[in-house]
Amino acid sequence: MKRIRDDVYASGSQFRRPLGSSRGQLCGQSPVHGSGDTEEEEEGGSRRVSQKLTTNDALSYLREVKEMFQDQREKYDRFLEVMKDFKAQRTDTGGVIARVKELFKGHNNLIYGFNTFLPKGYEITLIEEDDALPKKTVEFEQAINFVNKIKMRFKHDEHVYKSFLEILNMYRKENKEIKEVYNEVSILFQGHLDLLEQFTRFLPASLPSHSAAQHSRSQAQQYSDRGSDPPLLHQMQVEKERRRERAVALRGDYSVERYDLNDDKTMVKIQREQRKRLDKENRARRGRDLDDREAGQDNLHHFPEKRKSSRRAEALEAYSGSASHSEKDNLKSMYKQAFVFCEKVKDRLCSQDDYQTFLKCLNIFSNGIIQRKDLQNLVSDLLGKFPDLMDEFNQFFERCESITDGFQRLAGVMSKKLFSSEEQLSRPMKVEEKESEHKPELEAVKETEQCKKEYMGKSIQELDLSDCECCTPSYRLLPADYPIPIASQRSELGAEVLNDHWVSVTSGSEDYSFKHMRRNQYEESLFRCEDDRFELDMLLESVSSAARSAESLLNIITEKKISFSGSFRIEDHFTALNLRCIERLYGDHGLDVIDILNKNPATALPVILTRLKQKQGEWKKCRDDFDKVWANVYAKNHYKSLDHRSFYFKQQDSKNLSAKSLLAEIKELKEKSQNDDDVLLSISAGYRQPINPNLEYEYLNRAIHEDMFKVVQFSCEELCSTKEQLSKVLRLWENFLEAVLGVPPRAKGTDLVEDVVINPKTLDVNHSTSPNGEAAVSSGGDTARLASRKLKSAANGDENSSSGTFKHGIGLLNKDSTGKENLEDVEIANRDGVACSAVKPQKEQETGNEAEKRFGKPIPMDISERAAISSISIPSGAENNHCVVGKEVLPGAHEIQAKPSDTLTDIHHDVDSIETVHSTQGGDVGNSIVLANGLRSDSSKGTRNSDDPEGPSRNEKEEGELSPNGDFEDNFGVYKDHGVKSTSKPENSAEAEVEADAEVENEDDADDVDSENASEASGTESGGDVCSQDEDREEENGEHDEIDGKAESEGEAEGMDPHLLEGESELLPQSERVLLSVRPLSKHVAAVLCDERTKDLQVFYGNDDFYVLFRLHQILYERILYAKRNCSGGELKSKNLKDTNAGDPYARFMRVLYGLLDGSAENTKFEDECRAIIGNQSYVLFTLDKLIYRLVKQLQAIVADEMDNKLLQLYEYEKSRKPGRVIDSVYYENVRVLVHEENIYRLECSSLPSRLSIQLMDNIIEKPEAYAVSMDPTFASYMQTELLSVSSGKKEEGHDIVLQRNLTGLYDLCKAMEGVEVVNGLECKMSCSSYKIAYVLDTEDYFHRKKKKKKTEQLWQRNKVRVERFHRFLSA
């Protein structure tokens, strides 16, 4: 028959079928067969031609679509996306049809053309679609009503109703013909003609039976009267045929990218894949047939009778099924059981929603959406609280698995029938409402199943609940999609009060439940004792209970109160624990004994009772014995078990004591305290670093130092391999470590007599002038007299030598105190009561000041202050009237008394800081002079060497000056302060006169004008100020013979006699012996402020080794102090201390510590003793042996390290300066020269109170200095001859006597400079090639005069008067 849409297509289509295809093919009636041949078949008078489609057909269709939407490119692109999604299996055929239909809406020719490529059974209809949907609604409702009518009619005979559903289901599964259906239903409805007649309305008209034919004729008459189509049987058969012979849909990407295909091989491959895929989808598609039919429910109820009848038959087919003939009998019985089970589930489930959910689960399983395991999980959620129903469901499931797709078919029948009947009887719904309801439910089920798969096999401990809701710190809410296990025996009360959703996640197993508080070994011992006691108690209680039960039963048997007939059971008299006890009592034969007891209790019971009492007695005796053992364990371990900190402390302390950890600690503190403003300020002030200690410690108990020394000494004797190493380590401890910390030295018996030294800080020296002109020295103590006697006794009789000769030089000054570059240095000598003054040449002063480089802030200093800090010198003799350094006297001023330093109790510090003077034994050796740094200097001319008569002396070096190259170094001069005072008194004036003459004779070359660089400082500061014409002449005649470039020894560089170095160096103590090999290192230093508080400070600059040493020392000090403080109350805390008369607890602790160090005591014994003496807080002392070992090893490393020894020598060198003259910046710069880029630590110790502060200094990289080794020789010669040269003229023979009244100008100048701040920070740089001088950026000079407060007040008063006058003028 020719369909209406064919006419529409023929009249209105602009799309031409490629290769001459008919309209029928374009309408979707040309399936692609597997053989690929062309088929022709008659169907309702119409001729359909099925021809194989090619790629060209698809490309032609694409061109047509592209031309149609050439102005709407997005639609064409969307069509290509649909094809790509279908190829990638992201959508199925139904989805493609829906999207194409919507996309080509209004373009029927394209839709009909697209039908050409669809398989059989799939086509897009446009006209009939509007009529088909409302008809299905009426037919479906009538079918539902008919099925319910049958159910009500045969409610007492469920077999008929279930058999009817089984027949329909088999028909729906295409396993039963329509004739068989009618015959079986006729037999089933025998005696109920109304039901049979109503049933025939749903069947096709052409049936062989008479009743069916008669009914068909009446129906045909009705169809012909209404002019509708033939009966629907033919259409139903055609649809069934289409379902059986579904063609393969054309799959592929129909985009223009496929133009390169020139054959149909790809099409054949796609068709094969589609067949395989459709085979898997058949089962799911059959289940969707019902949903497709339900989609047509609308409010239209009127349609032709012929079509209505066919639609009713189709609705009945929705409930019909099919099964193979061999499985027919099994399915029948299973259907009956299934429906009975469903009714039982409905009755047990109180909620109708739960029952509907159960049916939905069966439905989605029958459609192949979920698997068997998923279904069982879903059903267990619903029926878990009914174990009997769950067991019956699982058994029924297993029986159905024996039949091919048995349960799936059964589930489909059960779900569709019951679900549809319950749903439709309760509330008929529209298709839109159904789809909107079922689709979210199916999606929710799928998501739930997916989440269950994720959570499957995972315990709650493995879940990540960090993002879940938190109720308390311990409890968190489980995820909403986490499957909650069903409690099978939960009561209603339990369901109300018990929790299923809030869980407390454990963090580990039982043994490690508290990772931050693990049980120590003593607790483990206690736990084992408790376990043993509990187990033995349980055994005793078990055997006692079994014995009582056996004895009671035996008494009953003896009294014959029980009969051993068939009703006797041994379990009625023995509990399970009793029987288990008897079984364990006999071991492998326990089951046999129980069997004998059951068979013959009268005979077996006495034997068993005897055995039970025997074991009971043995175990009681065993418990009594073990009680003593357990009591001993408790006594030993209870107190120790309370110590939870020692285990972790011992683990962590080994890391904390390592050098890496200590270094990291101070670096971290420095980074935290780092202030950007301080850094900028330090840079702007000439790279002066702020003094901000990173660590500070106090040493308030000095008695601890003695205990520490003894402990370290004891350990060193055990660890040091040689006596020499032991001596070096102990000397480092005493002479350096304790000296820095201000620890008083310990007595050494007669050794102190050999090395008597004088500490300037302990002397109160008053300088005065006697009437006869002799310098009088007043000593404040016996120490000075003892030293004076010793110095006199060291004299060798040489008239040029003097006992007690002192000569002190001053250190490098920070700035020109007066702020005047050409300030003349004045020396005031006092010999024979006559004061004289020597003024250095103006050119010499200018040259010295020009070469000096200054950094930092100047320190204003008047003459009195300079005199107070001046060096001490004793003239060694005089051969003429040359001026000798003496006491400085100012006009109108009283005599100046040297300010005594604070007297320290630290005698050992005095030993380290005093300059010991030894007289030489040979008459040919010159006088020994104590330098500013504590060294002796020979003043005889024989020790002076020079390359030329006009050059500077090689052996005259300035403190704080780096000397990498002698030639270059000698070209620089430094500013010198020449205030010198006498510190010893000659016995008579003649002796003083001789000494003065010798001094002048030996050192008058220092001011020789023939020297080109007369400003070069000698080893002693005052040496250059003593004028001697005879020495000048001798230098002119004798120093030309010296070899140019001769290397000088370090001792000679300091102006010392090499004979003294060789002969008497061994007589010096170790603290002074290191001074013989040191020299200044750095040329340029930054300014520092001299403060009164610095007089009590000991400053040491060291590297990482010294920092670690002081930190280990401090830790050891704290722990021993901790032990001493806690020893008083420790014994009261210990309950197991037996020796109550042990004496001093601290002394006992020290004895135990010595035993640990020498190996006589083990660590366990030491820990026990510490707990007994101090208590549980003694855990910090358990690692003392390791701490002391590290400390001794660090001492050994410092003694053996070359760089560390250099730092120690440099410290002694700096410490040898006169108190108050130590310049911190000089020291720091010298250390920087040594350690280069390593860390530098500033260790500062104050004496009152004893406090140690440690600071990690910044590594500031300053601008590089030009050393002589890298300077151009031509430029060096130019600088020496032109820039740094002085007048070569000789001095006149005589010198004018300078009276004190001539110093008035200088005094006025100094007074005028009071309150003035001068910073000479301007720097210049010179080009070595062009000799051009340029200023250095960011450098400047600074001059500021502080205004007096009085002047400010006067100015304010004047301004106030002027303001008042102005106001009066305005008011007038």
Swiss-Prot record:
* Pfam families per record: PAH, Sin3_corepress, Sin3a_C
Disulfide pattern? none
Residue ranges of coiled coil: none
* Molecular function, one GO term: transcription corepressor activity
Where does the UniProt annotation locate this protein?
A: Nucleus
Assembly: Interacts (via PAH3) with ALY2. Interacts (via PAH2) with TBP1. Interacts with ALY3, GATA21, TRP2, TKI1, VAL1, SKP1B, FBX5 and PUB14.
Composition bias of kind Low complexity appears in: 210-222
Residue span(s) of domain PAH: 51-121, 136-206, 331-400
What segments bear the compositional bias annotation Acidic residues? 990-1013, 1028-1042
Q: Which SMART domains match?
A: HDAC_interact (SM00761)
What this protein is reported to do is described as: Acts as a transcriptional repressor. A histone deacetylase (HDAC) activity is required for transcription repression. May play a role in telomere stability.
Q: Return the protein name.
A: Paired amphipathic helix protein Sin3-like 1
Give start-end positions of Basic and acidic residues composition bias.
272-315, 938-957
Q: Which gene encodes it?
A: SNL1
Q: Which GO terms describe its cellular component?
A: nucleus
Mention one GO biological process in which this protein takes part, according to its record: negative regulation of DNA-templated transcription
**Which keywords has UniProt assigned to this entry?**
Nucleus, Phosphoprotein, Repeat, Repressor, Transcription, Transcription regulation
